[in-house]
Amino acid sequence: MAKKSMIAKNEQRKVIVERYAAKRLELKKALVDPASTDEAREAARLGLQKLPRNASPVRLRNRDIIDGRPRGTFQKFGISRVRFRDMAHRGELPGITKSSW
């Protein structure tokens, strides 16, 4: 079980990323636009630097939705590999069976 503070911090980051997503996209487009001037690129670069660090989606962590485990998470299911195995053995995941050949 992850610390509740770490789970809460990640949730807060999700909110911040969502809040600044449109502005970040606009500034990123200005940086790579071949028609923009050097001054416009410089202004876009400075604008990106002024955004909060937590506005970057790279700082988000995929966590298990049940207990918040930060590593070994299956994106398709939103749970960790450990929880996935337990739930699959108990038959709680429809369509998932243990392979045998």
Curated annotation (Swiss-Prot):
Biological processes, Gene Ontology terms? translation
**A GO CC term?**
small ribosomal subunit
Name of protein: Small ribosomal subunit protein uS14
The UniProt function text for this chain reads: Binds 16S rRNA, required for the assembly of 30S particles and may also be responsible for determining the conformation of the 16S rRNA at the A site.
Query: How does this protein assemble?
Result: Part of the 30S ribosomal subunit. Contacts proteins S3 and S10.
Record-annotated disulphide pairs: none
A GO MF label: rRNA binding
Gene3D superfamilies per UniProt: 1.10.287.1480
Q: Which InterPro entries match?
A: Ribosomal_uS14, Ribosomal_uS14_bac/plastid
Q: Which gene encodes it?
A: rpsN
Q: Which family does it belong to?
A: Belongs to the universal ribosomal protein uS14 family.
Has UniProt tagged this entry with the keyword rRNA-binding?
Answer: yes
State the organism named in the record: Arthrobacter sp. (strain FB24)
In its keyword annotation, does this UniProt entry include Ribonucleoprotein? yes
One Pfam entry name: Ribosomal_S14
Sorted UniProt keywords: Ribonucleoprotein, Ribosomal protein, RNA-binding, rRNA-binding
